[in-house]
Amino acid sequence: NKGRTDEKARLALGDIVRVPPLKTAQRTGDVKTAPVIREAELPVLFEDEHLLVVNKPSGLAAHGGSGVAFGLIERLRASRPAAPFLELAHRLDRDTSGALIVCKTRKALVRLHEMQREGKVEKHYRLLVQGDWVNDRQHVKAPLARYVLPSGERRVKVDEVEGLSAHTIFTLIERFGDVSFLDAELKTGRTHQIRVHALSTGHPLVGDDKYGDYAFNDDVKKGSLGVRFARLFLHAMRLQFIHPVTGSPVTITAPLPAECEALLAALRARGRVKDAK
């Protein structure tokens, strides 16, 4: 009625209400500003009209936020401006490498989210841990809870009271005495689950700057294991699931990065390898 009012005003029959125009964020904004990503930086492991599975390198965040302007998904959209729909089906930590699913249709995304909640997506990781892991196969069922450091950094810990249920199956591949090479199968998908579960057994991951042994990792960076190694040794190696749209079985394998293979080769060359039974 040609005047301003507040939220307490009651409307009467015949009142004229004008709402000022609102500025809304446009999805095209990240396409214009995010740098494109070359295929050599992000190898494609599988692609059809519904799914895109890529081999994410260590150091690339899956998405923007927390001090990261653009992550993998924003850069992927910038690289494929004609794609109407690109969304992450799950996430990997910034320092974790390996297979990551991107959905190209909403139908695939919704179904894949359901499948993950139902435990119908099998996920295997390769990791190198500090110390001599002796069990051929070990189930770790320890509830996990998030907390915040005084610096504002978010972390995860085992918390029997307030934690959410979490289950990881570790399988020994090779023992090298001071470090051990393992497979980890995720039965749940909590933040930092493998890293914190491994730590809870007394075996932090090699190169883990959040939960690892800082002095040990510093020595590893300098070549104490035979070659210089300066990243988290955690790689999403294999995904196995039924295609969310076609119903066909899908198995994706992401080869270990060259730097991880080089470290394993150096460890094997020391002649201290003990294969798991």
What are these regions (language model features)?
Residues 4, 177, 182-185:
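Short histidine-centered loop motifs in beta-beta connectors
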Residues 23, 42, 161-164, 187, ...:
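Pseudouridine synthases involved in rRNA/tRNA modification
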Residues 130, 173, 185, 242-244:
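A generic structural motif
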Residues 1-151, 164, 233, 253-275:
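RNA pseudouridine synthases
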Residues 44, 129, 169-172, 205:
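Conserved hydrophobic positions within beta-strands
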